[in-house]
Amino acid sequence: MSKNKLSKGQQRRVNANHQRRLKTSKEKPDYDDNLFGEPDEGIVISRFGMHADVESADGDVHRCNIRRTIRSLVTGDRVVWRPGKPAAEGVNVKGIVEAVHERTSVLTRPDFYDGVKPIAANIDQIVIVSAILPELSLNIIDRYLVACETLQIEPIIVLNKIDLLDDEGMEFVNEQMDIYRNIGYRVLMVSSHTQDGLKPLEEALTGRISIFAGQSGVGKSSLLNALLGLQKEILTNDVSDNSGLGQHTTTAARLYHFPHGGDVIDSPGVREFGLWHLEPEQITQGFVEFHDYLGLCKYRDCKHDTDPGCAIREAVEEGKIAETRFENYHRILESMAQVKTRKNFSDTDD
């Protein structure tokens, strides 16, 4: 990160945050301003409860408290923070986060109990990792793509473990991937084992903040380790879940720097995107090849299934839309309805 002096606007934000803090400090005293130094720029590389690890402009990492006036703080947030003074007594952290800059994007996931939760900020692209083993699932890829389109974050499809394919298998998989290439998605074929195809992936990651998404078994961690180098292997930092819902462990999202440039946020929150909180219209919009046919159906309330005069189904029959994608569209809608039914049943059971 380059070291930047705070602009007047940023300084005003710090001061305004301070004034709000003064008005809301009756419940519990906040930290004394005299314990901290001058404001500086930083990026959150991880969040742990009411603490955050902030990387300063010179690359050092500081464990910071978070002002109570900050309502949302996640990995990837760019912040204004202040270092703790060496003489500060009773403060076991190195600084405090004062303010959060406006986000360019935010990655969220639905939660049955807390609604839609942010899990990472300022993401440039989502790398959808799939593999031929344990199974190449286009349905899972399509689910991730719908989530990317809804979040308005650029996706890249990465197919791992291509070293396990023979010539015939490679031809078949390429035909499957052509479905996505033909509608404008970038597809990269790689092997974390042999490192085939890693160079184009490195180039796609350079200068951008990425997050890797993929189900268990696709080699996401192995791929990240190969890209980060052995000295920066992804480690799981288990923290206990005290939700009262049983014994669970989770891992905190963390930002890493690639040696070739660019950053990656590794988060367990994107192993699988839930789509049940979306409306059917949002799922339809998430299939980019449908866009040219929306509004052309005979009936305004067309479900794009067996409805007479459905322009999307006609495009499928004419070979303009891949039948596999059309089938997965309806599978997603069906799975959403099932999850919502279970959620509604659970709500009425409380």
From Swiss-Prot:
GO cellular component: cytoplasm
Single GO term (MF): rRNA binding
Cofactor binding annotation: Binds 1 zinc ion per subunit.
Quaternary context: Monomer. Associates with 30S ribosomal subunit, binds 16S rRNA.
Principal location: cytoplasm
Record-listed Zn(2+) binding positions: 297, 302, 304, 310
Superkingdom, taxonomy of origin: Bacteria
Gene Ontology biological process terms in this record: ribosomal small subunit biogenesis
Annotated InterPro entries: G_CP_dom (IPR030378), NA-bd_OB-fold (IPR012340), P-loop_NTPase (IPR027417), Ribosome_biogen_GTPase_RsgA (IPR004881), RsgA_GTPase_dom (IPR010914)
Keywords annotated in UniProt: Cytoplasm, GTP-binding, Hydrolase, Metal-binding, Nucleotide-binding, Ribosome biogenesis, RNA-binding, rRNA-binding, Zinc
Binding site for GTP: 160-163, 214-222
Domain CP-type G, residue spans: 104-273
Protein name per its UniProtKB record: Small ribosomal subunit biogenesis GTPase RsgA
Pfam families: RsgA_GTPase
Coiled-coil region(s): none
HAMAP family hit by this protein: GTPase_RsgA
E.C. numbers: 3.6.1.-
